[in-house]
Amino acid sequence: INDLPVPRMSRDPDADRVGMACKDSNGEWVLVNGNQTCMIFLYYIIKNRIAMGKMKGNEFVVKTIVTTELIKAIADKNNVEMYDCYTGFKWIASVIRENEGKKQYIGGGEESYGFLAEDFVRDKDAVSACSLLAEICAWAKDQGKTLFDVLMDIYVEYGFSLNHTVNVVKPGKTGADEIKQMMVNFRTNPPKELAGSEVVLTKDYQSLKATDNKGNVTDIAQPATSNVLQWYTADGTKVSVRPSGTEPKIKFYIEVTGEMKCPKCYAEAEKKAMQTVEAVKVSLGL
């Protein structure tokens, strides 16, 4: 069965998350992460609706703030509105509810392997996601492509992105105090640069304020506050940091973006991005 080119998919026991793997251009099995999965789903949905003439101009998609910015690039280039929300599908469901009867939801997800293709469930749903994935694989095959080819097409058209998460575990009451102090320190003394690139925008979801590198402050449109900080650099890197709500750890979500001119450039783009990730970790003392 490992000789077959078709991708593999699996869901978790409560059927709300889907994971998948496919063969790369060298015939080696690779895992498709949650950000890539969400990108592939939304790319297909948008492209398919355009091809079938179903776009009415009122469509929107939703992602969480720690999910890849490539989804915004896909949405923007295809004139689809995109909403950012907090981690958790209750927030995606809230955006759907707010726009009900006015705009059409066509998909949304988060980096932790959750996706919702339709609005009748209002929670992440692996059953419909697995069905959609099978449809995408058939669509790709009809074009003589693999799922990995589709991912490469996305990177070439919309830009390359690599996401890396760092979990810093701090157990016990002492650890909780350390995490709290880390967030205080990041707010009072935020990084001026990451991996040698200037931080041009800082978002603080606790104060709901965004501050650029010239000191200009704007409001962040979210329905509530959250203990999350984000830094955006001049070279397209995004770092999000937040304490876990369920475990004794603080999480750093690092996204490095860049150009990828052709599918054969993937290995080099990935290598370069990982070097930037490691440099970002050094900048943050991780």
Mark where each language-model region is.
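Short Gly/Thr/Asp-enriched flexible loops that form oxyanion-binding sites at enzyme active sites
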Residues: 16-34, 71
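Catalytic or ion-translocation cores adjacent to nucleophile or general acid/base/metal-coordination motifs
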Residues: 33-45
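N-terminal small/polar loop signature for handling phosphorylated ligands or for N-terminal nucleophile
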Residues: 1-19
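Phosphate-binding and adjacent anionic-ligand microenvironments
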Residues: 6-7, 28-30, 48-242, 249, ...
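A generic beta-sheet turn/junction motif
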Residues: 13, 245-247
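Short, electropositive, low-hydrophobicity segments enriched in small/polar residues
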Residues: 19, 23, 38, 118, ...
